[in-house]
């Protein structure tokens, strides 16, 4: 009796990581199917530009890789879902004075939810991506573990996994360094082996989110006042969507000293300006929580926490609140804690969970 190969659908962006992920899984004996999520909108600038995972060139790169690996390739239409679950909330968050992370929302709602359900609907056992993270089962629970390549670790953007999603997801790149992934791609003759990493927001071609929001919702972007913490007017801003906490460049203010964005008030349409010391805080409130290592936080625990993708984990205590949110208290002050960003909790290399920063205390 022959054993049936397990089927895996690999989400392919046209980049080197997902391409090598497909190769590694085929080598491990899986029946591999390549698929690219078509998420670009009716926007020729985005559709035709080079590089990003939304572009037509990325689809062609993924198709060529699948031809090389001799695996089937499909393009799946996620346009409506991407607009509803990623783009529209992204715009609204900025209008509401927060700074969102669209990659986290895309992972949560599309890649590891809708794509997984579509895959299971056609009899596929697993989905896989080129993310730098590891999934391991310990006792009766799946764990999300930091990548072996600390510089490229992507667990910050992956904390929303459910146990069922982890059970049906493969991330083969987590066992390798980025340099080794590129070497493998070159060794097997993949043209994407030296393709540049995509670092900008995939649906914004010039990385100018303010201009993007102005074009999408012109009536929602209004100029207002820069004020100090006492409410004194220091100048005019061009719309709160252009600013984020801790920002110094591009303010267009001349006040004789270095100043930074310390708060954004959508109710009054004001951007609060202050000294650098004003953007260092130790406490925050987070909501929209997801925990991986347990179902619910019952008591306060000590963790390491990251407040943005590029931050180093810092020692903190998370305290459950009666309303279902948590208070996070850092041992040391953190620079530019920002509403709308995620705070992610770690125990060493293990991801405990995370949530959205809703308030800074």
Curated annotation (Swiss-Prot):
GO process terms (BP): tRNA wobble position uridine thiolation
Binding site for ATP: 11-18, 37, 130
Family matches, as InterPro entries: MnmA-like, MnmA-like_C, MnmA-like_central, MnmA-like_central_sf, Rossmann-like_a/b/a_fold
Gene3D superfamilies: Adenine nucleotide alpha hydrolases-like domains, HUPs, Translation factors
Purpose of the protein: Catalyzes the 2-thiolation of uridine at the wobble position (U34) of tRNA, leading to the formation of s(2)U34.
Active site: 106 (nucleophile), 202 (cysteine persulfide intermediate)
Stated family: Belongs to the MnmA/TRMU family.
UniProt organism field: Clostridium botulinum (strain Alaska E43 / Type E3)
Protein name: tRNA-specific 2-thiouridylase MnmA
Cellular component GO terms, alphabetical: cytoplasm
